[in-house]
Each structure stands twice: as C-alpha cells, then as structure tokens.
Amino acid sequence: MKVGLKMLHDQVLIRPHEEKDGAGGIYIPDSAKKKPTMGLVVAVGAGAKNSNGTFQPVCVKEGDIVLYRKWAGSEVEHDGVEYVVMKETDIIAIKEGK
C-alpha cells in the first residue's frame, strides 16, 4: 500500500485497526472506544544511527501487523486516512502467521 509519504530515520507509519461497533450493532461513542494498539505498517524509514555511530536498519517492514504502546506516536491524517507515526522502539511485537 503506497501512501505517498516517505518516513525518515527510524519512523514508522501505521494504519491502526479500527474498533468495530459493539455487540449486536450497538453504537459506541468515540469517547468510550479504546485507543487502537494494533495496526498495519504502511511505510518505514531507512533506520537511524545508534549510540556507537553505526547505522541500524528498521526491523519492521511494509505489510507487517504490529502491536504498539497505547499512547505511542502522533496521530496524523493524509488523504483522508488516519495514521499513527511512531519510532520503531514504540512497537512491541510483530504478528506472526495469518
């Protein structure tokens, strides 16, 4: 999925998985919904230099489903789509399998 944004350094662009309506189609107001903590990686930076000056590439790749810290990153909108931009270190895990 190309979004027309190039991430820099160790930044990762994630499209959060949206919460579905409540059981039986009950409407859940935005204020009561949980903040997503899982999403699809849509763009990644090339990496960053670590403390000893060597280049460290990013471990995640486009298409990965990741679990991230609840309040990580910054919410951004691009072309009408909501994303979260965060540092790779705010990603906790990569989902394996289908």
Curated annotation (Swiss-Prot):
Single GO biological process annotation from the record: chaperone cofactor-dependent protein refolding
Pfam family, one: Cpn10
UniProt keyword annotations, A-Z: Chaperone, Cytoplasm
SMART domains, per the entry: Cpn10
InterPro entries: Chaperonin_GroES, Chaperonin_GroES_sf, GroES-like_sf
Coiled-coil positions: none
Highest taxon, organism lineage: Bacteria
Localization (cell): Cytoplasm
UniProt-recorded Gene Ontology molecular function terms: ATP binding; metal ion binding; protein folding chaperone; protein-folding chaperone binding; unfolded protein binding
Functional description taken from the UniProt entry: Together with the chaperonin GroEL, plays an essential role in assisting protein folding. The GroEL-GroES system forms a nano-cage that allows encapsulation of the non-native substrate proteins and provides a physical environment optimized to promote and accelerate protein folding. GroES binds to the apical surface of the GroEL ring, thereby capping the opening of the GroEL channel.
Family: Belongs to the GroES chaperonin family.
NCBIfam families associated with the record: PRK00364.2-4
Record's subunit section: Heptamer of 7 subunits arranged in a ring. Interacts with the chaperonin GroEL.
Stated name of the protein: Co-chaperonin GroES
Species, as recorded: Neorickettsia sennetsu (Ehrlichia sennetsu)
Gene designation: groES
